[in-house]
Regions:
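A short, acidic/glycine-rich surface segment
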Residues: 31, 41, 56-66, 98, ...
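N-terminal beta-strand motif that seeds the catalytic metal site of vicinal oxygen chelate
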Residues: 1-19, 73-75, 126-138
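Generic beta-structure capping elements
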Residues: 48-50, 57-59, 125
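Vicinal oxygen chelate
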Residues: 1, 4-13, 33, 41-48, 64-138
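Core segments of cupin and vicinal oxygen chelate
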Residues: 2-3, 9-52
Length: 138
């Protein structure tokens, strides 16, 4: 059934501006764009240890029931330093959605609203690190 995360999709009124903002944050440009990088309606980044995909889609293609206010499920991306990551996000225009919270030993979360209205969660998650270091099944 559910086999793994493939793509996290965010919406933006201005995909080109979101592309620039996320390129600055991630330190890498998108690897995929439609119809092109100059006037995109969709861009996709690969990031992290397992190259998960972050897609940014023009709001014109959002489902009719989609809200324009931040809300819904929060996807948390693992980071090694939540405080430093939140400070970086705030310095480039994000706003605090959920402040830094200690969730127990080895688990810290926080989330921000990006300049395009999406919630971006970050987390230090000891389980994530354990999974990365576990021997791979053959």
């Amino acid at each position: 059934m559910l086999r793994g995360l493939t793509t996290v999709s965010f919406w933006a009124d201005d995909v080109a501006a979101a592309q620039r903002w996320y390129t600055e944050l991630l330190g890498t440009p998108p690897y995929f764009a439609r119809p092109n990088l100059e006037q995109p309606v969709y861009v996709e980044f690969r990031l992290g240890d397992t190259q998960h995909e972050l897609g940014i889609i023009d709001c014109r293609f959002a489902p009719k029931a989609a809200t324009t206010a931040p809300g819904g499920a929060i996807v948390y991306w693992h980071v090694d330093d939540v405080v430093a990551t939140i400070n970086q996000l705030l310095s480039i225009g994000a706003q605090v959605y959920e402040p830094i919270m200690q969730r127990g030993e080895g688990f810290t979360t926080a989330s921000v609203i990006d300049p395009f209205g999406n919630i971006l969660g970050v987390m230090y998650n000891q389980h994530y690190l354990e999974m990365l270091s576990a021997p791979k099944a053959t």
